[in-house]
């Protein structure tokens, strides 16, 4: 297997040396490039970074959550995935029912005030446990609305119906593989003004040639150190699952990013990662008894021979 880190590492270097220093909504500041692109040939191994540990279990559970059309964090919490907790927690602490400590600007305050962080961590733990234990509470406060799962599988129509974009694109790949309309979108202009965080992964398109299925993602904004490593592995897994259902071999994952940026408080971590030597890419194992995307569960997806460097911690810009 080949080293699959190189395209990512090369882009990190290019941003650090050629990028534009910009302000951003978090106040942290970034160095960014516009219109970056990376290409990964999945026949050369599964493209999950090896120069630091990337938690594949979180990637699996999040993608399966999207593909279920689920928008409630309860499924994620059942699989010990806390990626989306803060969005649901915000709904709870800003509701009239919440009577606990003041949680205004909890994301920023929890990073800057150790005393507040202890209070925040306790409230978050209680919230997550209540989501797991209380179905009615989970239905009311665990639902995130029109996030990726809803847009992919239940895109609302003007007539009151919905479009299942994933089912539609799978059928089109099978019946009309040369189509240039093999597209799934998550960007709904009507929802953007009211969204806490409008979709970063705006659109992806499939391409069939020589019995291989490829996928290109257009991502409007990419946090290169923390977010993009997840995105690379997640969409490579999505490509692999849909290739399985459509009876095709895996081709390329092409990752196009509008604003590819490194936060200024991640510069030291990036320099550390760039010093590390990559390992060969692991192999993705999919249960040979499963074919349909909808049938896959956590145990049906594994990485074989995933060697990696240690975790490199970095603060989240909020």
UniProtKB/Swiss-Prot annotation:
Keyword list, A-Z: Cytoplasm, Methyltransferase, Nucleotide biosynthesis, Transferase
EC number: 2.1.1.45
Top EC category: transferase
InterPro entries: Thymidate_synth/dCMP_Mease, Thymidate_synth/dCMP_Mease_dom, Thymidate_synth/dCMP_Mease_sf, Thymidylate_synthase, Thymidylate_synthase_AS
Localisation per UniProt entry: Cytoplasm
Binding-site positions, (6R)-5,10-methylene-5,6,7,8-tetrahydrofolate: 223, 317
Single annotated GO MF: thymidylate synthase activity
One of the GO BP terms on file: methylation
Pathway(s) annotated for this protein in UniProt: Pyrimidine metabolism; dTTP biosynthesis
Xref: Pfam families: Thymidylat_synt (PF00303)
Catalysed reactions listed for this entry: dUMP + (6R)-5,10-methylene-5,6,7,8-tetrahydrofolate = 7,8-dihydrofolate + dTMP
Keyword Methyltransferase assigned: yes
Positions of dUMP binding: 25, 180-181, 220-223, 231, 261-263
Keyword Isomerase attributed: no
Record-stated family: Belongs to the thymidylate synthase family. Bacterial-type ThyA subfamily.
HAMAP family recorded: Thymidy_synth_bact
Subunit structure: Homodimer.
Protein's name in the database: Thymidylate synthase
Native source organism of the sequence: Lactobacillus delbrueckii subsp. bulgaricus (strain ATCC 11842 / DSM 20081 / BCRC 10696 / JCM 1002 / NBRC 13953 / NCIMB 11778 / NCTC 12712 / WDCM 00102 / Lb 14)
Underlying gene: thyA
């Amino acid at each position: 297997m080949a080293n699959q880190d190189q395209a990512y590492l090369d882009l990190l270097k290019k941003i650090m040396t050629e990028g534009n220093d910009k302000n951003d909504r978090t106040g942290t500041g970034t160095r960014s490039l516009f219109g970056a692109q990376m290409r990964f040939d999945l026949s050369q191994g599964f493209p999950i970074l090896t120069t630091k540990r990337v938690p594949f279990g979180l990637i699996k559970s999040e993608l399966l959550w999207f593909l279920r059309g689920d928008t409630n964090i309860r499924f994620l919490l059942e699989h010990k995935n806390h990626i989306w907790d803060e969005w649901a927690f915000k709904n709870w602490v800003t509701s009239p029912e919440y009577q606990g400590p003041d949680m205004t600007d909890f994301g920023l305050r929890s990073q800057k005030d150790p005393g507040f962080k202890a209070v925040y961590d306790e409230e978050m733990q209680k919230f997550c446990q209540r989501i797991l234990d209380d179905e009615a509470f989970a239905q009311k406060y665990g639902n995130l609305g029109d996030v990726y799962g809803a847009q992919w599988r239940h895109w609302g129509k003007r007539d009151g119906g919905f479009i299942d974009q994933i089912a539609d694109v799978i059928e089109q790949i099978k019946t009309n593989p040369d189509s240039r309309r093999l597209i799934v979108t998550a960007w709904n202009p009507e929802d953007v003004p009211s969204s806490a965080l409008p979709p970063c992964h705006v659109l992806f398109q499939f391409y069939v040639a020589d019995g291989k299925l490829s996928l290109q993602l257009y991502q409007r904004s990419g946090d290169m150190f923390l977010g993009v490593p997840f995105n690379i592995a997640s969409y490579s897994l999505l490509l692999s699952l849909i290739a399985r259902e459509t009876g095709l071999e895996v081709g390329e994952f092409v990752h196009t990013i509008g604003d590819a940026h490194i936060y200024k408080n991640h510069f030291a971590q990036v320099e550390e990662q760039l010093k590390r030597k990559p390992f060969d890419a692991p192999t993705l194992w999919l249960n040979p008894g499963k074919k349909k995307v909808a049938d896959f569960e956590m145990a049906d997806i594994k990485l074989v021979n995933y060697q990696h460097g240690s975790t490199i911690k970095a603060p989240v810009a909020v």
